[in-house]
Amino acid sequence: MKASRTHWSIDLIGGCFGIAIALGLVRFDFGIIGNLMADAQWIDVEDIGTLAAINMLGYLTGCIQQATVKSRATSIRYVQIAMITIIASIVLEGRSTNLPSQSVLRLLCGWGAAHVVSGLPTLALERVPQRWRRKATGLIMSGGGIGSLLGAVGIGFFAPTSAPSAWNVLATLTVVLSLPTLALLRQRKQLTAPASETLANSTNQTISNFNKSKINKLILIIILGFALMQIGQIPVILYEPLIAVNKIGLTPMMASNIDSLFGIGLIIGGLIPSIVPSKLTTSLFLAVIAAVGLAGMILFGISNHLITLSISIFLIGVWDMMTGTLTLDRLGQLCNEDTQRRAWSTATTIGAMGFIAFSSTTSQLAQHNVNLILAMGITAVSAQLILEIFQHRLSAKQQNSR
């Protein structure tokens, strides 16, 4: 096996761009393009939620697969196949003008995105020193915002009213962003897994000082908090363009440009943990950002003006990405890299199950009772805040017992 001569910071680019594709382009930008497909009469408005649920069904399948993979080499192979699947699916989606073909491609795209989101971050973090882990995690996960922003701005400028052109924009971005990610995966195939002695020692010390059952309970609470965040964001991801056009009266182009604020929020949400001193613990950070997310969701629900809508979308983007970044980092503090990958995959699996149930249940309400969808989203985020407060208190007990 070869040893890599590149600095570990190069790995973060491949990780960041992979997340940009899997989260930003595949998931976050679908609300924009789904609305354009409905305008083009490829699908009905109600089908946006249905396709999102199908996408998450594929996502769920991929998450379950990644969570059960024990071999590092197998995980890398799955992520490579997933990247190729995503590229092919997005290219073909721009040429599929009916619901059945879109359903198949959304399913495949979701499967691929799951393997990238679940398996890629830990691969990109393998060579990162422990003291840089939270910063590096933030940089990688900010890719979700970069992808969302690039997609929203690209569609807004080049294809504000054309579904085929919008898909072409996403396909071009996907191909370009995939190059560093595929290079990272090729490199990882040639390298042995680094021994994370510092992380292992830290984890063993934590478990010895704070019994294993309580650690497992803490991990479960963190996973459920992340899952509730994924459920709570659905009204914004799927129905922001619909609300912006029908409730506030914006044009489709303005709605797409407003959605770019979500991407900016995602980028900032990924970067904030990278610059905030470690004295602000990850467990406390999770509770604080859950409160920000709840404020953003409430503001989104009562928005009747462009300014309040813009602020709410930005806050929700920050909350979304910070929750993902901090959850991944916190899991890494509690367990080794392999267990972290599987715990992270489990978190995304449960979130995907909730996303499927929520989006499929609410798809019929989109046209006539969107306020009920918003209320359900706010309820989910309120539950997340309660869980994050609880996990912080449990983490504080852990620290006191050391």
Where are these regions (language model features)?
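A late C-terminal transmembrane helix in Major Facilitator Superfamily
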Residues: E337-N369
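Helix-loop-helix hairpin linking two adjacent transmembrane segments in secondary transporters
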Residues: W132, G138-R186
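Cytoplasmic helix-loop-helix junction between adjacent transmembrane helices
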Residues: L105-G143
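Helix-to-loop junctions at the C-terminal end of transmembrane segments
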Residues: G62-T74, G269-T281, A366
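Structural signature of the two symmetry-related core transmembrane helices
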Residues: R77-V91, L284-I298
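Paired small-residue
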Residues: P100-L108, I307-L315
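Pair of pore-lining "gating" transmembrane helices in MFS-fold secondary transporters
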Residues: H7-I32, N216-G232, F314, V318
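Extracytoplasmic gate region of multi-pass secondary transporters
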Residues: F30-G31, I219-D259
